[in-house]
Amino acid sequence: MPRKRSRFELSIHSLLLSVAVLSGAAYASGYYPPSQQVPIIPPQVPLKGAEATPDIHEFSLRHIFHRGTYEQPDFHARLDVKPDTRLRTVSEDGHEEEYIASESSLLASSSPLTIQRLADRRLPVIQGHLAAARSSGFAAALSPQEWALDTLPGPNITDKPTVLTFAQMTANDYIEEPGTGQWHTINGKFNYSGSFGWQKDGLRGHIYSDKTNGTVVISLKGTSPALFDGAGTTTNDKVNDNLYFSCCCGQGGSYLWRQSCDCQSATFTANLTCIIESMTDEDRYYRAAIDLYSNVTEIYPDANIWMTGHSLGGAMTSLVGLTFGLPVVTFEAVPEALPAARLGLPSPPGYDPRFPQSRQYTGAYHFGHTADPVFMGTCNGINSICTWGGYAMESVCHTGQVCTYDTVADKGWRVGLGTHKIENVISDVLMTYDSVPSCVAEEECFDCELWKFFRSNGSEITTTTTTTTTTTSPTRTSTCKTPGWWGCLDESTTATTTTTTTTTSTATTTTCMTPGWFGCNDPTTTTATPAPTVTTTLPTVTSTTTSCHDPGWFGCRDETSTVATTTANPASPTSTACHSPGIFWGCWDEPTSTTAVTSLPAFTSAPISTTCHSPGIFWGCWDEPTSTTAVTSLPAITSTPISTTCHIPGIFWGCWDEPTNTPAVTSAPTPTS
């Protein structure tokens, strides 16, 4: 048997509850400026004697509210529509159309609707929950006693005429003919002008009421982006849309997206605290929608409030409906589960506030069709019109129930932004189908699955790393016009230098009698008979020209001509011809060495040419080349070449037999410097 509570326990419980409510209100007053405060509105409860059977309501336009955002963030005005107020309808492309009569009525039926919502929905209490969520980064954790499961009259979404009536409310966009109405300033200065500047900035609400003022419908209409209605747009439209419906304020995607915050820290990584702070600024649509709703409840404190909207206005009405527990009917609304989770809206026990799409009994119904990329959450590809317009519409999940017309399968429509307009939806979808579709929840839907989000308190440290790289590149003294696999195949030129040389005609020859694996084990030095020492200071010019006409894989396979001209007394060069090259390297036949003839000034040398008819597979020459020794003309100088013959070449390199050396005999007259 449950234990009864004593009076003392009840008194303590009442005292703690009062302190909690006052603390939330104090927190809200400290965060929100005094200009935004309105009188405390009692919680909305079902009307007494609400009938269980559907009831017909006859609605008519009573007020037009306007809440400024960017250009006039403090502006809030109300126009009371009277019988003598003349209104004009404004089409979605911004052009004024025909006059309408303010007494025109719209019919809709109601049916019982169950909503799980907060028991205390007064504005200061709600603002306290939102402020606490913004401060801590998490939705307020509330006890089950703070929630109620209420059954109240709501729109009959199974009735086609009722759905059409709500769609017509969202399509009606009225302006007042100058001089026929009186705008009441709720907050801020209203600078009246015939051009109605408020059309271009802020959130506009059309207020419909039935004849008893027992049921009121708020139809929110945001500033329509030019991407949707063809009119001129502003940067503020993209900023607001990308802030609410993008994973990170238009960052991390296409370069065409308009960035509305700077919260991305790395690729697919963002600071969630930074995003939430940007979303809850006073000049954002969500704050404007709450202010507009609070003023309506001030006029109709005892009425049941229903909400409706199209596109961006539909998303804002859904967020307000989740906040205050109101019936909502939207059309082609932008998926709003992502901003609902980030705003920290309270969730009933048993539901994760990070996934508001999993909640039941929300009272929200979203009508749309499959050919609308905005409603389906697919207007974000690189080729989509949304992207080219600068909009980052990345959210894909709706809260509540989704009622979808499959126009792609039923009518063969292609997905396109032209099907998003509410007038097209009414004439081509809602009126053509015989019945309304069934409504289901999107519980298994997830937003921004590729992203990682972290929370911070604003004290994180950003570290910047600078890397310095030093690159050293070699300097070439020649230009290659025909490069090969492992070298240059075209002609090369060596620069001409002028030096002062001292030449001594002493030749030294070293013969290895016993070669080893890594050198010579028995070196023998033979010194030739020197000629008289000649010391000359002359310019030295060296020029080498190489031409390759038939390059191979690892070398040149055609004739190579070398022209050497030396004007000095250098050491004698040696040329060797190989008839039987080794398998890998070295020479296996008897080489022939020729010593060049040294000359004095007025020396002329003919070019030496070598021709290879059978080049090796990888490198070297396998045939017997033809060598031509230059004939020189010197005054009484005779030079005998030194030849060396190897009979037993080494396995890998070197010569294993005793070579034969012939000393050079030089005869020359006394040179003259």
UniProtKB/Swiss-Prot annotation:
Its EC number is 3.1.1.3. It is an enzyme of class 3 (hydrolase). It holds the Pfam family Lipase_3. Glycans are attached at residues 156, 191, 213, 271, 295, 457. Keywords: Autophagy, Endosome, Glycoprotein, Hydrolase, Lipid degradation, Lipid metabolism, Membrane, Signal-anchor, Transmembrane, Transmembrane helix. Residues 29-673 are lumenal. It is a single-pass type II membrane protein. Residues 1-7 are cytoplasmic. It comes from the Eukaryota. It catalyses: a triacylglycerol + H2O = a diacylglycerol + a fatty acid + H(+). The chain crosses the membrane at residues 8-28. The active site is at 311 (charge relay system). GO terms for molecular function: phospholipase activity; triacylglycerol lipase activity. It is found in: Endosome, Multivesicular body membrane; Prevacuolar compartment membrane. One of its GO terms (biological process) is multivesicular body membrane disassembly. GO terms for cellular component: multivesicular body membrane; vacuolar lumen. Lipase which is essential for lysis of subvacuolar cytoplasm to vacuole targeted bodies and intravacuolar autophagic bodies. Involved in the lysis of intravacuolar multivesicular body (MVB) vesicles. The intravacuolar membrane disintegration by atg15 is critical to life span extension. Belongs to the AB hydrolase superfamily. Lipase family. Binds to both phosphatidylinositol (PI) and phosphatidylinositol 3,5-bisphosphate (PIP2). This is Putative lipase atg15.
